[in-house]
Amino acid sequence: MPPPPHIKPENVLKRAQELIAVGQAPAALTVLHEHATSKRTRSSPIASLEPVMLLFVELCVDLRKGKAAKDGLYQYKNIAQNSNVGTIEIVLKKFIELAEKKVTEAQAKADEIQSSLESAAPSSNVEDLEAIETPETILLATVSGEQSRDRTDRAVVTPWLKFLWETYRTVLEILKNNARLEIMYQTTALQAFQFCLKYTRKTEFRRLCELLRNHVQNAAKYSAQMHAINLSDPDTLQRHLDTRFQQLNVAVELELWQEAFRSIEDIHTLLSLSKRPAKNVMMANYYEKLARIFLVSENYLFHAAAWSRYYNLLRQSAVTLSTNQGSKKDHPSVTEADMTKAASFVLLSALAIPVISTSRSRGALIDVDEVRKNKNTRLTNLLGMLQSPTRAVLFRDALNKGLLKRVRPEIRELYNILEVDFHPLSICKKVTPILKKIGDDPEMEKYVVPLQQVILTRLFQQLSQVYESVELKFVYELAQFPDPFQITPSMIEKFIMNGCKKGDLAIRVDHISGVLTFDTDVFSSAKALHSGSAAGSAESELGSVQRLQNTPAEIARLQLTRLAKTLHVTCMYVDPSYNDSRLQAKQAALTRAAAGAAKEHEDTLERRVIIEKKKEAATDALQRKQKEEETRKRIRTQQLQEAEKQRLAEEQRERELKRIKDEQDRIRQQELKKQLEELKSGVKGIDLNEIDLEDLDANRLRAIKLAQLEKEKNELTERVRATGKRIDHLERAFRREELKHIAEDYEAQKKVDMEIYERQKAQTLAEAEAKHKEAVALKHRLSRLIPVFSSFRKEVSEKRHEEFEKRRKAAEREFEAKKKQRVKEVQERRRREKIERENAERAKREEEERIKREEEERAARDAERRRILAEEKAKREEERAKMDEIAAKQRQREEEAEARLRAKRAGLSEPPRTESEVRTAPRLNIAPRTSGGPSWRERQAAKEAAGGAAPEAPKAEPEPPRRTGGYVPPHARGGSDAAPPAGNRYVPPSQRSSQPPSRTQTPPTSSPKPEEPKPLASGTGGKWVPRWKQQQQNQ
């Protein structure tokens, strides 16, 4: 069954617009809210949901329903964040714009109300001008109160300001920790900062900063979520840094110094996470705001350190820009005036650092000092310094960078007076004009008070070195400052008491005698200032206080030191051997050190290698452990995710089935109720109170309805028949009575129509006559203007004709020029096209010729290659033929040698030969044939017996040299199967005869010319010889 029609976004939007049109905006908002928060909305297309959400936020703003807007927008973000992020930004921007528009309208309304009240006040009637403020008016104003500006804003503007703040907070909560909506998040945060700055909302600004801080902390906590932001991404971190810098600027503008300091800490934390260095323009703003914060907190030491860092950054930017190594947008614009101003503030802030510690007392507890030390370490880290700054270090750094050349003259003179040539008796006279100049500058005026503290400290320190007691009047005369910055005696006494309390001064004030007595206790302890105090110390490292002479306490304290030095010098002069032994001991120590330096260096290098190896091993082990842990964690996470997905899928399936069943039941109940309501309202006479809805179905309801409708139809037909019959009688009676009065009525109507006609006719004639007279008078009045008008028209026509001719000729000339230019361009284009076409044809022709030439060259190369291959093949065939011939000859020689060898072996049993018997050919000892055929000797004897004398044996060729080794050359190895000489050559089994030669075989009788041995038969293991060759050999 399809869902109800109102579930579709288009139908919901249409229904809401209808409700708005009839003035039911709350009901429309309820419909839109139910649709936006419904689970069925998730399957709706985003394109159809966007108009619904735009109308929804508009109604939420009009009705100031922030919570409903938050619920709907959360649901819409969950629906659209995976498919279309742009629509979320559109809806949220619309939400913010509408809220801001409402605030603007409320302000305009408040201004209008206030202006109306102010304009109405002077016009009020006053009975007595001299007694305007009567007791009654005062009481009335106190009880009721007037419509003042604050009250108007509170009633009109403040609710919308609150709603706008809730809007910003809602949007930030919706967009937080989402990488796809990050840019919109940063933009909204900047808008919220501007809202707080524009309307001076300090409380909301604090809450906004805390909200953003929690979002960043939660980003690292929930980094495994889908679409979570990654602070390791440089672009994401840069956007957060930009937002924090804007937060810092707004905090400074609102003078919320604590929140500004927390913003500084946030920026420092983000900078520590950043892999890329921050831009100089951002760091310049960072140090400038940090200096202002330290100044407000009266932390002059770190204030001066921040100015020093700021000046270093300006110097670095100036050098970078002068060498064109960086872009101007990444560096602050630096001019000579800016450098002079920054240098002046660096030196002035360093001079204003108190010499007496303002944050330590004699009885300071250890834990308090530890907390202060931790605080200073944290401030040092914020400045990016390696160690805590001191007054002496800042002065030395300023002098090394040549700041005295850049500062303003009065600041340079003040430095010389206070730090170089301090004279207590004339200090105030010298400083007075300088303080006046500093006091005239609004930015430097705030340094006057700390400078006075420094001057007083210097004054009392040097007076204590010269005098034991001075008059109070004398001290008051010395401490005279310019009029706006005059110091009273009570302020001087307060300063003395503070210095005594902190342990930096030892002064007693006797008001009876009017004398200041400096402490002369020779056993008083040294007053070393705390190195980690927030205000720093002037006496650290270099001792910047000029020492006029030692005090009695210092003399007593250093007595043992002086005695030791004097005794040492005396021993050196009295006993020369003491000095010699000292020098020898020193030389021996140097020798030992030189001897052990090399070994120590090697040991150090070995230890370094061992340490590096251990570090690498530990690092590898740690990385392996981390990888294994990450793998296990990932596997476990995947398993949990899979289990969670499966569980959610099961739950979703069950919920879907239950929802479908419930929806079906709900729809069935709704249809039944709807049909019952239709029966109750449309069909009368049915009693449905006793019918149970659970037993009803659609068929039974339809049958009840049809029966009742049939009954009503019959009753209606009967009533209509009776009523028609009654009406017919009445109509006939009415018409019978009307016939008597029709003629009278017609005459009266004719008379009335004639009177109306005459009256309208007279009125029309009068209006026409008056109009005609007016037209004639107008004609006579305007006829005097006809000659002037004609001449003017003729003059204008001539001028316009001349101008037209000029323009026409100019247009013709321009047309001809453009025509010639066009013809020239066409000719040039055709010529260029022709040249390009010819070039293309020539290139094509050259390409074809090149291809043809390459084909011919390729064919020639192929023919040459074939010819060479044929020649090589012919040569190989010829060489093969030669080798075959040589092999045949070699085989023949070997067979002859084998035959001779065998004949020699066979002749051992024969009688010894005579000397007259000469062998002309070798005699072969042929193995007996295994087959049943006759041997060659028998065949030869048979031929002779047949009467044919045997042909003369050919002349024996000289016997080739006999090979004694077993090596056979390759050409003879494959072409001869003759056996090597006995005992020297291996005969394979396949070539051996089946039976060994018989030693008892009687060889044939010797003849002067024995026959040439024939080739062996195939059965004896020799090489196969073709038949034609056998016949040729037999012949």
Swiss-Prot record:
The keyword Protein biosynthesis applies. It comes from the Eukaryota. The keyword Cytoplasm applies. Residues 943-953, 988-1004 have a biased composition (Low complexity). GO terms for molecular function: mRNA binding; translation initiation factor activity. Residues 339-523 form the PCI domain. It is found in: Cytoplasm. GO terms for biological process: formation of cytoplasmic translation initiation complex; translation reinitiation. Residues 619-649, 809-1035 are annotated as: Disordered. Keywords: Coiled coil, Cytoplasm, Initiation factor, Protein biosynthesis, RNA-binding. Residues 92-121, 606-910 form a coiled coil. InterPro entries: EIF3A, eIF3a_PCI_TPR-like, PCI_dom. Its main location: cytoplasm. Pfam families: eIF3a_PCI_TPR-like (PF22591), PCI (PF01399). GO terms for cellular component: cytoplasmic stress granule; eukaryotic 43S preinitiation complex; eukaryotic 48S preinitiation complex; eukaryotic translation initiation factor 3 complex, eIF3e; eukaryotic translation initiation factor 3 complex, eIF3m; multi-eIF complex. Residues 619-632, 809-901 have a biased composition (Basic and acidic residues). RNA-binding component of the eukaryotic translation initiation factor 3 (eIF-3) complex, which is involved in protein synthesis of a specialized repertoire of mRNAs and, together with other initiation factors, stimulates binding of mRNA and methionyl-tRNAi to the 40S ribosome. The eIF-3 complex specifically targets and initiates translation of a subset of mRNAs involved in cell proliferation. Belongs to the eIF-3 subunit A family. Component of the eukaryotic translation initiation factor 3 (eIF-3) complex. This is Eukaryotic translation initiation factor 3 subunit A. It comes from Emericella nidulans (strain FGSC A4 / ATCC 38163 / CBS 112.46 / NRRL 194 / M139).
